[in-house]
Regions:
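Conserved class I S-adenosyl-L-methionine
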Residues: 1-40, 54-58, 137-158
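Conserved SAM-binding loop
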Residues: 3, 69, 140
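A short, aliphatic-rich alpha-helical micro-motif
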Residues: 39-40, 103, 125
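Class I SAM-dependent methyltransferase SAM/SAH-binding core
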Residues: 46-48, 52-99
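A short acidic, Gly/Pro-enriched loop at the edge of an enzyme's catalytic core
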Residues: 97-109
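A short SAM/SAH-binding and catalytic strip from SAM-dependent methyltransferases
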Residues: 108-121
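A short glycine-rich, Lys/Arg-flanked "PGG" loop and its adjoining helix->strand segment in the class I
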Residues: 122-137
Length: 158
């Protein structure tokens, strides 16, 4: 399986976005999403669809003991390793559907702006549930269609 983010033209345009250049401070949703984070001190964290690894780095800054960031895109993982490297963070090129979610392994699973790409969302939710430790937290944020809708799109009337 390949990722649209491995397409050079698409990736080059993505790299121009404020979130790519400025990290979390350049992401419009960050300040609301940040408020949902639990205490990560000493916790194991999984970031599914980690992109540039900004949330992985934030988790370490908040005291996480171990963080794994997975993303289907080789280009994204390359950037994550370049921009957000830390001994407590491991990055892996892997699709969400293909990851072997070990049972009760993570205190927190992060998914920011990625699950809208997944066809079988129920399967991913079940896998995430299994991989969370008791009382674990799943932080989920998806893209609203208004954000990606073109300004010249026509309405469909029924």
């Amino acid at each position: 399986m390949s990722s649209i983010y491995d397409n050079k033209q698409f990736f080059d345009e993505y790299a121009k976005m404020s979130r790519s250049k400025q990290g979390l401070a350049g992401a419009g949703e960050w300040y609301q999403f940040k408020a949902l984070f639990p205490d990560l001190d000493g916790k194991n964290v999984l970031d599914v669809g980690c992109g540039y690894g900004w949330h992985c780095k934030y988790a370490v800054e908040c005291g996480a003991s171990k963080v794994l960031g997975i993303d289907l895109s080789e280009k994204m993982i390359h950037e994550a390793r370049q921009k957000n490297s830390d001994p407590k963070i491991a990055y892996r090129v892997c699709g969400l559907e293909d990851y072997d979610y070990p049972a009760e392994s993570y205190d927190c699973v992060i998914s920011n702006l990625v699950l809208h790409y997944i066809a079988d969302i129920d399967s991913i939710f079940k896998k995430i549930y299994v991989t969370l430790k008791p009382n674990g937290v799943f932080l989920l944020n998806i893209e609203h269609p208004v954000f990606t809708a073109g300004v010249n799109q026509d309405w469909i009337y029924d």
